[in-house]
Amino acid sequence: MELRSCTYATVTTLGDFGPWISKVVLDLPCTVRANDIDANTFHIYVERHERSGEVLMRKERGADHAAPSVGYIDILAAYPCDENGRKLAVGTHVALEVAEQRLTKKIEGGVMGSRMLDDQLHITQLAALPGNDGDDLTCGLVFDTCRGDICPALKGWSNDTQKTAVDGIALEYGFFEPSFKAEDSACFNPFAPEATAVPQKAPLVVYLHGAGEGKGATQGEGATRAYIGNRVTALSQKQIQRYFGGFAWVLVPQSPTFWMDNGVEQLGRSNQSIYSPVLKALIDEFVAEHADRIDTDRIVVAGLSNGGFMTLRLCADYPDFFAAGLPCCAPWYNATDEDVVALAKTPLWFTHSKGDELVCPQQTVLPLFARLRGAGANVHLTYFSHVEDLTGVYREADGSAKKTFNHGVWIHQFNDLCYQDFDGGNVLIDGEPVGCWEWSARVSR
């Protein structure tokens, strides 16, 4: 039997634990119906490659040596679809749904550094398909050429580079641009479209990534990993956008090293950063480029871990600039009186977890929060007892909620689950409880 080479596309989902291939779309030379295919019609072999070309060698937990990151993955469902993977009754494309697992992950690394991978798939036909117009059955299809990737969550996202360098540094960044069309608003009501307000100017959320999403030694990636390595794209989705009236810009700069780099130590505890003036210049540049569309009284800065530190550094350095700051598991040690005075000028909502393995709360957020409260600051702290999945998506083998390391509390921030204040009560605005994102959307400079 002669084999026929065909093309495929991947569909990427951006999840709490990074981007992963959730679906493969096969481009068929024939038309199929739903009852012509099932999960056993094809099988999928995956090789995870470094961008340099070689197969990723990975040491799995409990293993005594590294092994090639390759293998077969199970198909959960198969059905006719269009070229983008949307389900149809009849079509010339087939969607193969697969599970989130190591072999479908698109980023490799950890909290101190990561990199994008090139996942290469080889899909083989195992059962005959109908022919076209009475032709013989279709057999021997091999899908070994990827025509591209589809990621719905990246709609509206772009990458760019800072135009004017500061101290020789020009940051790469990603950004989400709202469409300013009523039908695209997170608040759009199809039954009353005329009621959807489209503002002339929209708020801006600046989000600062953690240590693992900096540029480091990677080349040619652009800033994409800064907002997909952890699910910063949640800020462009309906759940959080609706708090900002359905339209909010998102700016995600990427650090060349670490935001905590003070010019001497890359991860020191001096609470200083060489990137503070660079970031402020980038924000000013970005705002100037979109001056007719950004509300400068509603610029919110937020960040996780290393980026949580940088959130506080920017608020301390530019105390009259930001409407609010949302630092998550922020490593700010030994705050001075001057730090407290400066930080107290910006409304802040901290998120942290008890038992954080990397940023001890007793040395960072707890004393800083207490001093800010004592100074009369507008400050809140959501303090989780531990970190586990609260969405019902991720489960342990016994069916209980999946537990992760306690430093990873940002998954709760991105899932809009930060509501409770440190004293166990709700944060209220106009008598109604709000979470950190709604709170930040309702304050202004």
Label each PLM-derived region with a short phrase.
Residues A202-L204, A211-P277:
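Active-site machinery of serine-nucleophile hydrolases
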Residues M1-V25, A39-T41, V46-A202:
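A domain-start/cap signature at the N-terminus of enzymes
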Residues T196-Q200, D261-S305:
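Gly/Ser-rich "nucleophile elbow"/oxyanion-hole loop immediately N-terminal to the catalytic nucleophile
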Residues A211, S255, L326-Y333, G355:
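Active-site nucleophile loop of the alpha/beta-hydrolase fold
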Residues E289-D292, T296-A342:
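Primarily recognizes the serine-hydrolase "nucleophile elbow" in alpha/beta-hydrolase
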Residues G245-A248, A342-L348:
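Short, proline-enriched alpha-helix->beta-strand connector loops that line the catalytic pocket
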Residues W349-T351, G355-L358, Q363-F369, R373-R445:
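C-terminal catalytic histidine-bearing segment of alpha/beta-hydrolase fold enzymes
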Residues I107-G110, K215-T224, D261-Q266, R313-L314, ...:
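Short, solvent-exposed loop/turn and secondary-structure capping segments
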